[in-house]
Curated annotation (Swiss-Prot):
N-glycosylated. It comes from Vipera ammodytes ammodytes (Western sand viper). PROSITE patterns: ADAM_MEPRO, DISINTEGRIN_1, DISINTEGRIN_2, ZINC_PROTEASE. This is Zinc metalloproteinase-disintegrin-like protein H3. Glycans are attached at N377, N506. A motif (Metal-binding) lies at residues 339-350.
Length: 616
């Protein structure tokens, strides 16, 4: 997989202005004291229940730069999955997993009245803390520690004293943007009905965040402090990704309070590889999820603030990223995590031609002091191309309502325990099969949505709801008893395909020839067998796998499970042993797992040529 670095650059030096104040975010030189006035405005359906501590909607009025503003807040009901869990460890190493009640939480999204482009991400747990955008500028707000007072400080990030003003440069500040032409082609594609349905469907990323041991020490060994910081980060992630029709549900939080489960090292690439493997072999066996992010207190070598695999969402090992907790202002840490998750969703670094209407966009190769929460036009097209080409399936699945540990919330678009359907608020609902006020089916309806729901009735048994996508896939059909299409079924792994040139693997037929075409174009073919002997060298030109960052040479019988060697038949390309290799994406150009490497033999995920019956 391609790994993409994110680093920090903060070049401005800000003069001392007025008296300084110490806030959670650091020493702030220039700030405005505001006094919040809660505005009573009971919206339809926004009745506070007697046992509810935090209201579903709130409004506050205060002044910014002497002008009154009204901040509208709405509880982020998509912040947690119904089966959200937290894991930490006892002193003797025992795993302790709990399902804390998170329904009546204090995390909100919002907007400023009469500013159509405004956004807000606010924690209302103890006063208001977070950020809001007003007339294109980002402000931070947090309570002053004055007893029995509504006094808050409002300030800009530029007025926070920096612990280290030394400019930091980026190892990959420039991206060649080699896929720019592909982006143009993707936007001009005539999509199949299946691709169009996929693009239009809302996406749900079930996220697990892991905080390492240094984070535990950094925040005074306080599980509560770390939990609060991560909740605030995920609340902002939801604001950022909502524009892409993506909902992020935190399904798990794990804190390594008794020591790290992997070696968390200053070498970001090594740490990411170790974390991805741990996710695949350990975390996924304990907690079903789509994506994992490691939040670490370690300082990576150089200016690196994060690292993520490119185009890897739903992959067991590579749907992951690592992020350094590099700033007291959690807004900037959230931007770094949004950036790494953007790589997982197929977005590369922005080139000079990319724009988002701000000085810096989410997928800029550097994280600047003037960062915005917007994706550039390039990022949005790159993401769209990735969805069209790869169609990752796990993010189509809403978080399950089974194993629910908190009360259902009608109107959050998630069907939870006790609900038949959920089409949003009565104002937004456009589904005639669902009563938005009760989240129950309308009279006479059997279903409200699903691939096997046809005009509020279950589809006829045997109706194809998911056509076969190639010879290694099978068509899935409706049962007549449910609105949902059954679990996607594939031809069994190891079944011969492509005229016995390959074996089916997770619904695809990976063969060397197609992989060469994918890398070098239609004129490419597989190189001669002699070329694959370079995989015995154990360097960038040939190896079978990496262990702790070290390239392991292929054994003689495994050479066709290492780097892929191709021959491009175009006259201008004379190299008979051509590979795809660049330092920033070392894993691209390796032979895909499941590829046939001999009669009855296939490549394992560990780069070994093994019996096809044991390869999977």
């Amino acid at each position: 997989m391609i790994q993409v670095l994110l680093v920090i650059i903060c070049l401005a030096v800000f003069p001392y202005q007025g008296s300084s104040i110490i806030l959670e975010s650091g020493n702030v030189n220039d700030y405005e004291v505001v006094y919040l006035q809660k505005v009573t405005a009971m919206n339809k359906g926004a009745v506070k229940q007697p046992e509810q501590k935090y209201e579903d909607t709130m409004q506050y009025e205060f002044k910014v730069n002497g002008e009154p503003v009204i901040l509208h807040l709405e509880k982020n009901k998509d912040l947690f999955s119904e089966d959200y869990s937290e894991t930490h460890y006892s002193p003797d190493g025992r795993e302790i997993t709990t399902n804390p009640p998170v329904e009546d939480h204090c995390y909100y999204h919002g907007r400023i009245q009469n500013d159509a482009d405004s956004t807000a991400s606010i924690s209302a747990c103890n006063g208001l803390k977070g950020h809001f955008q007003l007339r294109g500028e980002t402000y931070f707000i947090e309570p002053l520690k004055i007893p029995d007072s509504e006094a808050h400080a409002v300030y800009k990030y530029e007025n926070v004293e920096k612990e280290d003003e030394a400019p930091k440069t980026c190892g990959v500040t420039q991206t060649n943007w080699e896929s720019d032409e592909l982006i143009k082609k993707a936007s001009q594609l005539n999509l199949t009905p299946e691709q169009q349905r996929y693009l239009n469907s809302p996406k749900y990323i079930k996220l697990v965040i892991v905080a390492d041991y240094i984070m535990f020490l950094k925040y005074g060994r306080s599980l509560i402090t770390i939990r609060t910081r991560i909740y605030e980060i995920v609340n902002l992630l939801n604001v950022i990704y909502r524009v892409l029709n993506i909902y992020i549900a935190l399904v798990g939080l794990e804190i390594w309070n008794n020591g790290d489960k992997i070696n968390v090292l200053p070498e970001a690439k090594v740490t990411l590889d170790l974390f991805g493997k741990w996710r695949e072999t350990d975390l996924l066996n304990r907690r079903k999820h789509d994506n994992a992010q490691l939040l670490t207190g370690i300082n990576f070598n150089g200016p690196t603030a994060g690292l993520g695999y490119l185009g890897s969402m739903c992959n067991p090992q590579y749907s992951a990223g690592i992020v350094q907790d590099h700033n007291k202002v959690n807004f900037l840490v959230a931007l770094a995590m949004a950036h790494e998750m953007g790589h997982n969703l197929g977005m590369d670094h922005d080139g000079i031609q990319c724009t988002c209407g701000a000085k810096s966009c989410i997928m800029s190769g550097t994280l600047s002091c003037e960062a915005s929460i917007r994706f550039s036009n390039c990022s949005q097209e790159e993401h769209r191309k990735y969805l069209i080409n790869k169609m990752p399936q796990c993010i189509l699945n809403k978080p399950l309502k089974t194993d629910i540990v908190s009360p259902a919330v009608c109107g959050n678009y998630l069907v939870e325990l006790g609900e038949d359907c959920d089409c949003g608020s009565p104002r937004d609902c456009q589904n005639p099969c669902c009563n938005a006020a009760t989240c129950k089916l309308t009279p006479g309806s059997q279903c409200a949505d699903g691939e096997c729901c046809d005009q509020c009735k279950f589809g006829r048994a045997g109706t194809v709801c998911r056509p076969a996508n190639g010879e290694c896939d099978v068509s899935d059909v409706c049962t007549g008893q449910s609105a949902e299409c059954p679990t996607d079924q594939f031809q069994r792994n190891g079944h011969p395909c492509q005229n016995n040139n390959g074996y089916c693997y997770n619904g695809t037929c990976p063969i060397l020839g197609k992989q060469c075409i994918s890398l070098f174009g239609a004129s490419a073919t597989v190189a001669q067998d002699a070329c694959f002997q370079f995989n015995r060298l154990g360097n960038e030109y040939g190896y079978c796998r990496k262990e702790n960052g070290r390239k392991i040479p292929c054994a003689p019988q495994d050479v066709k499970c290492g780097r892929l060697y191709c021959f491009d038949n175009l006259p201008e390309h004379k190299n008979p042993c051509q590979i795809y290799y660049t330092p920033r994406d070392e894993n691209k150009g390796m032979v895909d797992p499941g590829t046939k490497c001999g009669d009855g033999m296939a490549c394992s995920s560990n780069g070994q040529c093994v019996d096809v019956n044991t390869a999977y």
